[in-house]
Swiss-Prot record:
Annotated stretches, region: G4: 416-419
Keyword hit for Nucleotide-binding: yes
UniProt region (G1), positions on chain: 315-322
Gene giving rise to this polypeptide: infB
Domain tr-type G: 306-474
Cellular localisation: Cytoplasm
Protein name as catalogued: Translation initiation factor IF-2
Start-end of Basic and acidic residues biased regions: 79-89
Binding site for GTP: 315-322, 362-366, 416-419
Function: One of the essential components for the initiation of protein synthesis. Protects formylmethionyl-tRNA from spontaneous hydrolysis and promotes its binding to the 30S ribosomal subunits. Also involved in the hydrolysis of GTP during the formation of the 70S ribosomal complex.
Location of region: Disordered: 68-89, 141-215
Length: 805
């Protein structure tokens, strides 16, 4: 047989006397074409294909004959085997049956009986009773014997039946195997099939192993701790991934950093999570030491004792806050001191006839909420909102309500000045109901008390309501532990040095205690109560003026008693260093809020809104709130008419909000404070601009959508190697256009093997900017030379689109 390339499938089929279809099926299965197309009768065959066909079909007839002969030879052998098996079964059955024959058992029993009778005759004669007893015993023994024999017989029959069933099943399986159609294959085909089966089995085991490993990895929770200061290189080493992958993840989050640059800790956590880790920022050793030193003692229920409630009185100017506090304290401070009680210690405590006490914050309500809350302090338990019955709800009243609601402090409404002729307490109730404060008598949950601070009417009832609410809140503290408190206000006294008003929240503060407060520390040299009397100790909820600070503390700082001066000094110094580092990064910016919204950290965009008119306020508030959707909410935490004040800035700082001013400007104090606290204030003259800016915040202005667009496709038809240049691809542009400097991919057999850019583009030795469809050109890919004829070059560009709501 001649093995040449000229032979076609149909020629070989005729030569071997088989159908072309059989050979085509064989080739498609065991020798597919390189281009993936099916074989046809007209296709030419190479040497290897011919060899496989002759091996498979050349000895077909001989194999068939051999199979017929073997089948004939096997037939009588199988018959003989069956006969032998049947004989064996019969023998087994006979053996079992032999053992079970009742005649044999009867003969044996009779023989035994005869022997026993002879023995009995030889023995001396027994009494009738003994004989009867023996007969009965024998009968019992015989019954037992028969029972045992019967059980043995049944067991043997059962064993035989089981064996028969097993043999029947085996025969059925053998028949099924024999009935299966046998595929006639040559030795070479059998070898190929064996190898294929082995390869499939091997691949199957590998796949199972991979799946097990994958499942094991998924089940394992990888936890890592990221230090507060970490570079890209260190992060890559920690995650055990290449640095370029870390840089790519950082770029996705809008952070451009080189391998030696530091990564913000919150971004490092996100990158770690993208690689399947559960990450958290590792606290500095100094911070951990501080936490250990300042760790609160475990509270035991039996050590806790009721403490007086801390109440803040809020309301609009001239609605009677100072007069009410004056009436409660039964003093005349408002008349004797310039500026009222706010010029005194800053807080006061009153004792009622029944011995119970209430602590009142004398600082203005809004200041108590903003300045203190901005630094994370939680001092106030209850707020009393004073509203004049003859004036109704005013701008500062609404501001006070918003402050209280923002921090979930329960409100008691004191409707003041009911002694005036034009007083209308019901009007106050109606107006406050519109702001969510519905009276209890109307089915709501807000306590309303009609009072007259001037005459003292119903003031006792107001105090009862405060104590009732305090009982419901179950306010308790442990007076026997080291003291913790909050600084309400501080001042620098020329004679006494730094002085601060402190409300003790837990434990008891004593003269001589060493303490740390924010970034300063000290030792209690002296304490004075709200009436100016010197005291040696201050239990929970007691306001005192403290002397002994090294530096002036800030309002809102937490005062914590420690063991000694050295501990206090070390903690204060470390806090000061940390604060200096944080001040460089800490700022409330709109851009930061964008990022928080995108990462799901912030679910609502908080806004303090100030406008020139009520109409503008209502229109802008409605427009901004309509931008809310299921994912992100716009929340106007405070809206009012007028200029941007110091209070607005502090509220924004406290609640993480931005300030939007429409046709308004911040006053000098507010401007100074916004720069100091770094609160973002946005000023607008057109409603549309304000809406657009907030809209951009919601959709994520700093994270545009990345989109890729293919602009052209070319086919490589020749390659040229040029010294000092590399491989140049001679291309034909199939569609679109190729652009010099544009991004490009090299595709070979459907697989991307290069992704870079077009370094140079030429037409007849001339550099060109672009080449359109239907033209030839020379293309040099940047830093890549392994280009082959038949490859395709895909030219594309990346566009960034802004997301929409």
């Amino acid at each position: 047989m001649s093995l040449t390339k000229t032979k076609r499938v149909s020629d070989v089929a005729k030569e071997l006397g088989v159908k072309s279809k059989e050979i085509i099926e064989f080739l498609n299965e065991y020798y597919p074409r390189p281009d993936g197309k099916p074989w046809k009768a007209s296709h030419g065959l190479d040497e290897q294909a011919l060899e496989m066909i002759y091996d498979a079909f050349g000895i077909k007839e001989e194999e068939e004959k051999e199979e017929v002969v073997t089948e004939q030879a096997q037939a009588p052998a199988e018959v003989e085997e069956k006969k032998e098996e049947e004989k064996k079964e019969e023998v087994i059955v006979e053996e079992v049956v032999e053992e079970k024959k009742p005649e044999v058992i009867v003969e044996e029993i009779e023989e035994k009986k005869e022997e026993e009778e002879k023995k009995e005759e030889e023995k001396p004669k027994k009494s009738v009773e003994e004989l009867i007893k023996e007969i009965l015993e024998k009968k019992e023994k015989e019954k037992e014997k028969k029972k045992v024999e019967k059980e043995r017989k049944e067991e043997k029959v059962r064993v035989v039946e089981v064996k028969k069933e097993e043999r029947k099943e085996e025969k059925k399986e053998e028949k099924k195997e024999e009935e299966k159609p046998k595929i006639k294959m040559s030795k070479k085909e059998r070898e190929i099939m064996r190898k294929l089966e082995h390869a499939v089995e091997k691949e199957k085991k590998k796949q199972e192993k991979r799946e097990k490993e994958k499942k094991k990895k998924e089940e394992e929770v990888k936890i890592i701790y990221i230090p507060e200061v970490i570079t890209v290189r260190e992060l890559a080493e920690l995650l055990d991934v290449p640095a370029n992958k870390v840089i790519a993840e950082l770029m996705k989050r809008g952070v451009l950093a080189t391998i030696n640059q530091p990564v913000p800790p919150e971004v490092a956590v996100e990158v770690a999570e993208s690689f399947g880790y559960l990450a958290e920022v590792k606290k500095e050793e100094e911070e951990l030491e501080e936490e250990a030193l300042l760790k609160e003692e475990e509270e035991r229920e039996e050590e806790l004792q009721p403490r007086p409630p801390i109440v803040v009185v809020m309301g609009h100017v001239d609605h009677g806050k100072t007069t009410l506090l004056d009436r409660i304290r039964k003093t005349n401070v408002a008349e004797r001191e310039k500026g009222g009680i706010t010029q005194h210690i800053g807080a006061s405590q009153v004792e009622l006839p029944d011995g119970r006490k209430i602590t009142f914050l004398d600082t203005p309500g809004h200041e108590a909420f903003t300045t203190l809350r901005a630094r994370g302090a939680k001092v106030t338990d209850i707020s009393v909102l004073v509203v004049a019955a003859d004036d109704g709800v005013m701008p500062q009243t609404i501001e006070a309500i918003n402050h209280a609601k923002a921090f979930n402090v329960p409100i008691i409404v004191a409707v003041n000045k009911i002694d005036k002729p034009n007083a209308d307490p019901m009007k106050v109730r109606r107006e406050l109901s519109e702001h969510g404060l519905i009276p209890e008598e109307w089915g709501g949950d807000t306590i309303f008390v009609d009072i007259s601070a001037k005459t003292g009417q119903n003031v006792d009832q107001l105090l009862e309501m405060i104590l009732l609410l305090a009982d419901i809140l179950e306010l308790k503290a442990n007076p026997n532990k080291k003291a913790r408190g909050t600084i309400i206000e501080s001042k620098l006294d020329r004679k006494r040095g730094p002085v601060a008003t402190v409300i003790v929240e837990d434990g008891t503060l004593r003269v001589g205690d060493h303490f740390v407060a924010g970034t300063t520390y000290g030792r209690v040299r002296a304490m004075f109560d709200d009436k100016g009397r010197q005291v040696k100790e201050a239990p929970p909820s007691t306001p005192v003026e403290v002397l002994g600070f090294e530096e002036l503390p800030e309002a809102g700082d937490e005062l914590i008693v420690v063991d000694d001066e050295r501990t206090a000094r070390e903690i204060a110094e470390k806090r000061k260093e940390k604060k200096e580092r944080e001040e460089k990064l800490q700022t409330i910016r709109l851009e930061d809020i964008y990022k928080k919204i995108q990462t799901g950290e912030t679910k609502e965009l908080r806004i303090v809104l100030k406008t020139d008119t009520m109409g503008s306020l209502e229109a802008l508030k409605k427009s901004l709130e309509e931008l809310s959707n299921e994912k992100v909410q716009v929340k106007i935490i405070h809206g009012a008419v007028g200029g941007i004040t110091e209070n607005d800035i502090m509220l924004a700082k406290a609640s993480g909000a931005i300030v939007i001013g429409f046709n308004t400007r911040p006053d000098p104090k507010a401007r100074e404070l916004m720069e100091k606290e770094k609160v973002d204030v946005r000023l607008y003259g057109v409603i549309y601009e304000a809406i657009e800016d907030v809209k951009k915040a919601l959709v994520g202005l700093l994270e545009p959508i990345k989109k890729e667009e293919v602009i052209g496709m070319a086919e490589v038809r020749a390659t040229f190697k040029i010294k000092k240049v590399g491989t140049v691809a001679g291309c034909y542009v199939l569609n679109g256009k190729l652009v010099r400097g544009a991004k490009a991919r090299l595709i070979r057999e459907g697989v991307v093997i290069y992704d870079g850019e077009i370094e140079s583009l030429k037409r007849f030795k001339e550099d060109v900017q672009e080449v359109t469809a239907g033209y030839e050109c020379g293309v040099k890919l940047k830093d890549y030379n392994d280009v082959k004829v038949g490859d395709q070059i895909e030219c594309y560009e990346i566009r960034y689109e802004k997301p929409t709501l």
